[in-house]
Amino acid sequence: LREIFIVLLIDFYTHTHVGKENPGVITYVEMSTIDAQTSENIKMVIERDQLAEYLAAPVSGGQKDAKEGELLILAAGSERSYEKCLGDFEKMGKQSWLMGPECKNATDAKMALQIMMGGQAALLAECLSFCEYAGVDEKVWFDVLDKGVMMNPLLRSVGNRMFKGVENNRQWPQTLFQTYLQQKDLKLAIETAEKVHCEVPVTAAVHQRYVKASRKGHANEDFASLRDAYDEKKK
């Protein structure tokens, strides 16, 4: 008997198939970045067929965080299901939160994090492109940024990867988080925003930059390849 079954996939049909193929699971934990409706649909199938209790628990963090047990886990569901999973969450992540009883409490919070992540990377790429076109030394400017209050671990990591990709003939094969995944997450965020009648003009503009990066051949490369979406002169 598996007391907890953790899933991190991207399509609805695979999720439900996995649930049906693993009867006897007490708690089914959905850790993918999906929208609230998809999460609710999976929950409906899992609980309708009495396969398990359902806990939405999308994660924030990259491959390095996953390997080192440093993920941030945003859960939503019953307190009982959440408490059952705490031991596993403590091994997988740096911290976990019970965001509320409904799937959307976790999925929408994760969307907001992806908006922040995607937006910061886009703004950094835009700043570096501006420096290049204006004749400012990009690396010196980045060093200035690095010494100030605006720097954070995400910008530092993405910025360094942007420089490496430019030096590597504008290719970013070493992938920490793929461009198409960030593009997908922003699209989900925009669709969710429309449903709740929230304006997200900045996110919509940022999403188009990721679309452009994908069209330039960077879909399966690291999302630091967004640097190339701001450059028409060089390839």
Name each model-derived stretch.
Residues 21-26:
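Short acidic/histidine-rich motifs immediately flanking catalytic phosphotransfer sites
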Residues 105-233:
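Helical "substrate-binding/catalytic lid" subdomain
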Residues 13-20, 47, 132, 194:
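Residue-level signal for alpha-helix termini/capping positions
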Residues 9-14, 27, 32-115:
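Rossmann-fold dinucleotide-binding core
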Residues 4, 8, 15-16, 46, ...:
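Alpha-helix boundary/capping residues
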Residues 1-3, 33, 77, 120:
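Short glycine-/small-residue-rich Rossmann-like dinucleotide-binding loops
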Residues 4, 38, 80-81, 123, ...:
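Short phosphate-engaging motifs
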Residues 7-17, 156-165:
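Short, flexible, mixed-charge acidic loops at enzyme active sites
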